[in-house]
Amino acid sequence: MSESADDLAEVKRRIAEAAKAAGRQPDDVTLVAVSKTHGPERVRELLEVGQRIFGENRVQEAQEKFPALKADYPDLELHLIGPLQTNKARDADALFDVNQSVDRERLAGVLAKEMERAGKRPACFIQVNTGEEEQKAGILPADLDAFVASCRDVHKLPVVGLMCIPPVDEEAALHFALLHKMAARNGLAKVSMGMSADYETAVRLGATHVRVGSALFGARH
């Protein structure tokens, strides 16, 4: 097997073990391969060994890499996992299949208008700033329930779940447990949490989506 195939198999094995340890089915967990800062040739290597779901942080970088890859692999699914500026909403709606970065009223309103205009409705995760960090995107936990209701009832967004990025200097498990609890409280079945350093913990605590980069691609360029 190629190095990409080996890395992918190892991550999937660890996801499966973590899922089974929690009494879950491995197929209940979606692996999002985070390809930010890596060129299209690295993405293609993973596509060739069966990976189909990828995550990108920046709209412009994704625009440079993924149209050609999507043409070659029509079943490729692309997730936006980085902060989204309102002036990039149209481009994001056109390219991404899932938006994991919905985090404020103004953005929700712009996305709703764009979805209506284009007739394309990417599934939405609401990003929660569980650590309440000033420098980080995400709705604050105290404001989440009202924002979920607004996204559903006012903006009519296809909200399917929640996403978080825990503070690097805090125990990730506490944030994963909080996100899972908030998702359940709002009737949301999907939770995107866990990265290369902690995705097994996230799976044990109920993650339906894990965002893994360095364990698949190596260090960022």
Question: Which residue ranges define each predicted feature?
Answer:
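Conserved alpha/beta-domain cores
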Residues: 1-190, 195-197, 203-205, 219-220
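Gly/Pro- and small hydrophobic-enriched strand-loop and loop-to-helix capping segments
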Residues: 207-221
